[in-house]
């Protein structure tokens, strides 16, 4: 279901929106052989023996356990089943109010929700027997039947409100914008399972065994919130001299309450030299603009939703008087000073269009300083802390040059565009706040080194 609406209530009041609903249902009976097994199982393997038993022979010899359990024909014969339903709803509603010329007040609310419900059953299945002796082959059967139920819910809400004002005359042009936004994300999940059902016909979870060893359950929840205020002003003088100023203030629930706000200003200026009087007689230059900018951005992509919390391990048993005693261990200390990573970018650029706009050149030189980078640090073993929290201790500098050339032409009615790019970049670790060299395995066998004065992520 997909519905869109838009209506001009009055000359100055407009509403718009959309509603979407998606429902997916899956109901699968019997086995679900992995389709790849149809390609992987060799043609010389016997799928089913002449005596009715499942195949265990490949090329005159007993097949490997993986080939036997991957027999697609056998997988189709079992009594496994699974059922699931996913429902997704999205509402997007907004409005525009234009009370006076040049002034627009806008609001938008977006809600997206997704709910999943699933239930699956794994039936008993006898082991495959060898063709020659009839001996069961270990690891080829399902020895305990089981049922599991899963539920999850994801909701995301985003609200935005802005006020925009435009004013211009023959010389000046001014645009001002102010706004706020709020985002709330939440994920919840539950799961439960039982084993040892007396019959494959039972489809209720309560039909399984009540013994503790046959019961299982789990769940989880995570959420975050972001509140933002922002403003921007643009000024143009005779469409030649351009200025822009921005400011953002963002607060994230991923940080402790005293350290949640980050403030990120930015400024830019441009000069369209080709609009000047002394350029009017240079016909082969269609556009020549130089520009400069400086701005900051905040980053929380490397921050977990609860990284500033103190963590405890509830399963830390210890020995007291030769007896095991239940204990609680602090596995990670609180990290109340956790804050925003900040990127400060300085850029100098030029835009050129030549020869009736057939040739375009865009070139930029940039200096990018990233500060308060989240990095781990070494903790003395005697603290007993398993996992040290990351801290905002890193500084990295990147410098580089980028240029793109585009040529547009035609041969008769055939039009073509050719684009070429060149880019260089140099970076180094500027500061680790006195921390020792940091060695990371990058999730594999290759190790990387973070050392002051060296390129970030050098091979170690």
Name each model-derived stretch.
Residues 35-74:
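Acidic, glycine-rich flexible loop segments
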Residues 4-23, 31, 66-122, 135-454, ...:
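Extracellular/periplasmic, surface-exposed regions of secreted and cell-surface proteins
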Residues 131:
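Active-site-surrounding "flap" and adjacent substrate/cofactor-binding loops of secreted or lumenal enzymes
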């Amino acid at each position: 279901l997909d519905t869109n609406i838009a209506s001009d209530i009055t000359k100055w009041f407009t509403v718009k929106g959309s509603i979407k609903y998606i429902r997916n249902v899956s109901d699968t009976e019997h086995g679900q052989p992995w389709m790849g097994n149809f390609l992987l199982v060799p043609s010389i393997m016997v799928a089913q023996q002449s005596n009715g038993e499942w195949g265990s022979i490949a090329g005159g010899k007993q097949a490997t356990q993986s080939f036997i359990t991957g027999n697609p024909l056998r997988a189709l014969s079992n009594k496994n089943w699974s059922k699931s339903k996913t429902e997704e709803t999205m509402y997007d509603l907004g409005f525009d109010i234009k009370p006076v010329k040049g002034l627009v007040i806008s609001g938008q609310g977006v809600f997206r929700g997704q709910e999943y419900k699933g239930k699956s059953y794994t039936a008993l299945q006898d082991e495959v027997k060898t063709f020659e002796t009839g001996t069961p082959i270990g690891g080829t059967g399902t020895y305990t039947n089981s049922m599991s139920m899963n539920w999850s819910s994801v909701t995301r809400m985003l609200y935005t409100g802005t006020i925009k004002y435009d004013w211009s005359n023959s010389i000046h042009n001014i645009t001002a914008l102010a706004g706020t936004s709020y985002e709330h994300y939440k994920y919840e999940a539950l799961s439960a399972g039982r084993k040892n059902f007396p019959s494959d016909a039972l489809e209720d979870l309560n039909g399984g065994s009540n013994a503790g060893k046959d019961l299982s359950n789990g769940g989880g929840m995570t959420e975050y919130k972001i509140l933002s205020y922002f403003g921007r002003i643009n000024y143009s003088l005779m469409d030649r001299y351009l200025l822009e100023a921005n400011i953002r203030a963002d607060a994230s629930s991923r940080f402790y309450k005293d350290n949640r706000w980050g403030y990120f200003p930015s400024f830019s200026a441009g000069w369209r030299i080709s609009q000047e009087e002394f350029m009017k007689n240079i016909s082969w230059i269609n556009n020549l603009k130089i520009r400069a900018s400086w701005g900051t951005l905040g980053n929380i992509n490397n921050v977990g939703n609860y990284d500033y919390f103190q963590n405890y391990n509830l399963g830390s048993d210890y020995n007291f008087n030769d007896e095991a005693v239940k204990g609680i261990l602090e596995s990670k200390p609180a990290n109340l000073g956790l804050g925003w990573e900040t990127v400060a970018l300085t850029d100098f650029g030029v835009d050129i269009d030549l020869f009736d706009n057939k040739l375009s050149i865009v070139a930029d030189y940039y200096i990018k300083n990233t500060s308060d980078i989240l990095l781990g640090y070494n903790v003395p073993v005697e603290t007993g802390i398993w996992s040290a929290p990351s801290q905002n201790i890193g500084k990295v500098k990147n410098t580089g040059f980028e240029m793109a050339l585009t040529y547009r032409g035609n041969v008769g009615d055939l039009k073509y565009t050719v684009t070429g790019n060149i880019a260089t970049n140099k970076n180094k670790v500027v500061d680790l706040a006195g921390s020792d060299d940091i060695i990371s395995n990058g999730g594999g066998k290759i190790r990387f080194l973070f050392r002051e004065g060296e390129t970030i992520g050098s091979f170690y």
